[in-house]
Amino acid sequence: MLSDGVEITSRSGGRFGAYLGKPTTDSAPIVVIAQEIFGITPFIRETVEWLVGAGFGCVCPDLYWRQAPNIELDANVPSEREQALALFRDFDMEAGVNDLSCAIEYARALPFSNGRVAVVGYCLGGALAFDVAARSLADCSIGYYGVGLEKKVSLVPAITRPAMFHMGTKDHYVTEEARSILEEHFGRNKNLSLHWYPVGHSFARSSSPNFDQAATTVANARTLELLAMLKDPS
């Protein structure tokens, strides 16, 4: 069952909306989904449906609520893509992490939550998933094609809970130097797994020109394998 009428209180006292996916069981782990730069789009809602079908509940907060509440942009429309990039440039990452922290707390307290919460993020959300992992805010964190992770590697030693990141070797946001930095630093932490696919940025979004079904299938299977650790023993 899906609902879009949820509100979460921020650290500053403001309230922001979230898209909720209720699990099909009375007790399930909750996945907090961190959006791409385009807002809570059909792709994000499809991701909620996928994870609910896999036995999880979902909370997807509107991370643009301070800048452009409830905005939904089409990555394939040039003017909307430019608008998304402008929002991303002005986005307050620290505020975004705090909002995810509030969403995680909200998720843990839901009546159908088993108390365990993961974060799964894409693009902007993939970078935020790394920050969540570095602060041990969730029980596990997963990022798809997170932007700028090579600038955050000083935080790798702080990651004490399972975290997984899916990256494309043809991602135009990831240089060869950035890839080397990520491989070197991520390899030093046993809690981290880094997976590379021969694809470009946004490879998991079905509407993207870079969409790759084979890579998405493998990445999503790995994601579900990690998330399964949060389920109640059968």
Curated annotation (Swiss-Prot):
The active site is at 123, 171, 201. GO terms for molecular function: carboxymethylenebutenolidase activity. Coiled coil: none annotated. Its EC number is 3.1.1.45. It catalyses: 2-(5-oxo-2,5-dihydrofuran-2-ylidene)acetate + H2O = 4-oxohex-2-enedioate + H(+). Keywords: Aromatic hydrocarbons catabolism, Hydrolase, Plasmid, Serine esterase. One of its GO terms (biological process) is catabolic process. The keyword Hydrolase applies. It is an enzyme of class 3 (hydrolase). Pathway: Aromatic compound metabolism; 3-chlorocatechol degradation. Disulfide bonds: none annotated. The keyword Hydrolase applies. Ring cleavage of cyclic ester dienelactone to produce maleylacetate. Carboxymethylenebutenolidase is specific for dienelactone and has no activity toward enol-lactones. Monomer. Belongs to the dienelactone hydrolase family. This is Carboxymethylenebutenolidase 1.
